[in-house]
């Protein structure tokens, strides 16, 4: 890749995923308020936050270069991503506490839960923004409270939407998965990202 690549995320999971495509990127913290707006749908929320994170990441990159505004910024492609889960029509986010994680998994037990990941790529110089919503459905096993409690205490998925880490023991919670890209569930849909980078004139294969 010729253009500087910025990941607007401090998530170690997203960093590990992006490293599958290239080791040459910089991470910045986007510092975006993730509170949903009144009556905002899951799809609208993840698009708004992914775009906001990409722009905030560009601004942080600009500040680190010592530049005064985006119009004078060196060219970079900034990746923003956000994910929420929907259970029984309600948006759920990161549980933050063990009690909330146990409650989320009790709600999910025996059900199909859809995750929506918003992915944005923003050019810091031209201001071109591309964005996509990538859905992924998880079919949960019917889980006992003892199983859920054991899982939460073992893996502590407190900062994961849906209260699990699919790249770890969380895979044991699932009956089956539905989606085009399993990386989506971890937080960064790589197949979609490759296509979006191509829209900005970049390829990961050279």
Curated annotation (Swiss-Prot):
It catalyses: N(7)-methyl-GTP + H2O = N(7)-methyl-GMP + diphosphate + H(+). Its EC number is 3.6.1.-. Nucleoside triphosphate pyrophosphatase that hydrolyzes 7-methyl-GTP (m(7)GTP). May have a dual role in cell division arrest and in preventing the incorporation of modified nucleotides into cellular nucleic acids. Gene3D superfamilies: 3.90.950.10. The record marks 13, 83, 167 as: Important for substrate specificity. Belongs to the Maf family. YceF subfamily. This is 7-methyl-GTP pyrophosphatase. GO terms for molecular function: nucleoside triphosphate diphosphatase activity. GO terms for cellular component: cytoplasm. It comes from the Bacteria.
